[in-house]
């Protein structure tokens, strides 16, 4: 991955080491691996083929982890049970399949395991009010992210207007969850705002649901979208700086970045 990125990315970058059910022993020796910012664990199946669904295997990942474990938190058993709720051609059924219970069940399990071993877990793209309320009571080694898309869109409007272009995992939910996400941002409950960058070809996103892939672009849109929210008074510029610059370097142990200080390497984003 580092070779592929070289001379193609005009920004600072690092990659996750993907956890599987079979490589937990390898996770203990990642501290000095160049270009590795953390471990990625898919507790529920999503885009790609990485999946660590069994609690015993998740336990081994955290037990052996030498870096922060970033988690796609959905309960695979509930996803499988709920497949009968998928309605062909109706993307409105996406958040019914990938339900609130699916998200909070997984997140509770991840936090329980991480706290058992006193290991760091970063829960990615939180979408439910239940997770916000739960995670706000479990800080310290537990951090979490919210995405711009979940702070900008809500169901059912997004599916009526955008169809499968609004399809992602975990899904965009109704306004009660949207409002709770913003409550978290205003009160600094979340630690980061991340892109969950997952673009697809238009020809694939136009396929009939559920054959359409989940995900949307995010790297190039995160700052414009969030700055628009700053201009609308939904959060302050200083909050945004903490969510996208200062807190990520603390969580992932990135040296000499994230702050404007005399002794640090200066990285600026120009806003025009």
State the predicted function of each range.
Residues 14-17, 40, 194, 270:
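Residues embedded in well-ordered beta-strands within globular domains across many folds
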Residues 4-25, 42-47:
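Metal-cofactor-binding active-site regions of metalloenzymes
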